[in-house]
Amino acid sequence: MADQVICALSDVFARWFAYQQQRGIQVCCPEDELRPSPCRYDAQHPERWKPWSRPEMSDLQNIASALECVFHPAIHAYYGHGYAGQITASFKGLAVTLVQPWNEEDFERLQQNLVAHVLMLRRLKLPITLFLATVSDESRVISLDNETGEVVLEQLGKKKRWVLADSLPAFLQRLSPLAQTAVTPAVPVNLPA
C-alpha cells in the first residue's frame, strides 16, 4: 500500500508541476511560508520550492500508539514520505488543497492536529478519519476513513460523509492540477449539500 500511495503522490506532484510550467507559472510559496524547508532548492530565489523526499520514510506510529489505535497504512505513506508546499487540484469539480508538511516543525504540528481530530471524533462517537485535504467550505474536509481506507468528504463533527474514492491511490490518480495562483473553489455537481 505504501508504494502505491507514494507512486500516486509523486505522480500528482509531477503532473502539478508540469501544469504550472506549461502556463509559465513559477512555483513559489506564499510570503508567510518563507520558513526553512528542504523543499527550497534555489538560494537566489528562496520562495521557489519542489517536493522533498525523506531519505528514510517517517510514519505516524508514535501518535497512533499514544491514541491506542492502528492507523491505516496509507496515511503513514501520505504524510511520512517527505515535505511539500500547497498542491491545489480539482476532484470532479471540487477544488482541493492537499495537506502536506513543509518541514519537521510542520510535521510535528500536523501530528498534533491529527491527535486533536481523532480525539474530537472519539468524543462525538464518530468513526476515525484522518484528514488529507482542505476544501473551500471550512466545515468540510477530505479524509481517509481509517477503517476502510476510503477517501471521503466529511462534514466536520457530523456523520455526513460522501465516499470520493475507494482508496487513497485512486483518489490521487483522479486529481486534476489547478494553477497555483488561481484556486477558484468550485461546487461539486454530484455531491449533496
From Swiss-Prot:
Q: Subcellular location, in the record's words?
A: Cell inner membrane
Q: Which InterPro entries match?
A: Syd, Syd_sf
User: Quick one: where is this thing mainly located?
Assistant: membrane
Q: Gene Ontology terms, cellular component aspect? A: cytoplasmic side of plasma membrane
Specify whether Cell cycle is a keyword of the entry.
no
Q: Which Pfam families match?
A: Syd
Keywords recorded for this protein, A-Z: Cell inner membrane, Cell membrane, Membrane
Task: Report the protein name in the record.
Answer: Protein Syd
Q: Which organism is it from?
A: Tolumonas auensis (strain DSM 9187 / NBRC 110442 / TA 4)
